[in-house]
Amino acid sequence: MNWFEVALLGLVQGLTEFLPISSSAHLRIVGQFLPNAEDPGAAFTAITQLGTETAVVVYFWRDIVRIVKAWAGSLAGKVSRQDPDARMGWLVILGSLPIIVLGLLFQDQIESVLRSMWIVATMLIVFGLILAVADAVGKQERDLTQLTYKHGILYGFAQAMALIPGVSRSGGTITAGLLMGYTREAAARYSFLLAIPAVFGSGLYQLYKVVSKDGITGPYGLPETALATVIAFVVGYVIIGWFLKFVSTRSYRLFVWYRIFLGLALYLLLGFGVISA
């Protein structure tokens, strides 16, 4: 067991999950520079994301409790479905459908061919440029009370793009939000809430497979993965507050340049054979 490696990967997961730079890409990249030079694997990535998503639940627990109560009340007919919190509950469910369906349909590709470092590098650059355009041209006038069901499903398809490492779940959803005219902070908040069902679903499914039958694939076993998950939770909790404050006053330009630089650096490293695809 290499506890230093998994601690580092947990730190990376916590630092990058909520930033629009793709945590799965960073786990894939950092894995290449560790002594065993292996991909940590889709299962390791999904399970460690349980840590960062638990940080979302803890950070937003008041909002989540309020939304769940209102949504449950709307099911029972005690609360109007037009109640802002009840609507948010339905919007999160609606927005989660694309990633659930596409994740199941393309599970084999997601866990194999789509983890190619060439694809990671390309997605970092392409979606970095799209984020730059969205940040520049988005009107940034709408808040979450103006979120429509149509926009909710579009957010959902943007989130589903993050099944490809390098796209970034938060980056995809934030980009979609900006293009639809939402403020930076509103786009980020809905991105956090929207991720809860998808990330918990994926992580718990992978955990079930590990515990019940398959065993974890990749270089790290369940104890190491558990440590990485705990570290990801602690670091992720800190990052959420920082990121929301950052985007309330600053543009996403810093993340755009970082994505482009990292993507180009990966092309060079792959081209010269320093790392393998």
Curated annotation (Swiss-Prot):
Q: Name its cellular compartments.
A: Cell membrane
Q: What is the recorded name of this protein?
A: Undecaprenyl-diphosphatase
Keyword Membrane listed? The answer is yes
The EC category is hydrolase
Q: What else is known?
A: Bacitracin is thought to be involved in the inhibition of peptidoglycan synthesis by sequestering undecaprenyl diphosphate, thereby reducing the pool of lipid carrier available.
**GO annotations of cellular component type:** plasma membrane
Q: Function, please?
A: Catalyzes the dephosphorylation of undecaprenyl diphosphate (UPP). Confers resistance to bacitracin.
From the record, give the transmembrane residue ranges. Answer: 88-108, 117-137, 157-179, 191-211, 227-247, 255-275
**Recorded family membership:** Belongs to the UppP family.
Q: Which UniProt keywords apply?
A: Antibiotic resistance, Cell membrane, Cell shape, Cell wall biogenesis/degradation, Hydrolase, Membrane, Peptidoglycan synthesis, Transmembrane, Transmembrane helix
Q: Does the keyword Oxidoreductase apply?
A: no
Per the UniProt entry, what species is this protein from, by scientific name? Pseudarthrobacter chlorophenolicus (strain ATCC 700700 / DSM 12829 / CIP 107037 / JCM 12360 / KCTC 9906 / NCIMB 13794 / A6)
Pfam families, A to Z: BacA
Catalyses which reaction?
Answer: di-trans,octa-cis-undecaprenyl diphosphate + H2O = di-trans,octa-cis-undecaprenyl phosphate + phosphate + H(+)
Q: Name one GO biological process term.
A: response to antibiotic
Q: Could you tell me one molecular function GO term of this UniProt entry?
A: undecaprenyl-diphosphatase activity
Q: What is its EC number?
A: 3.6.1.27
The way this protein sits in the membrane is described as: Multi-pass membrane protein
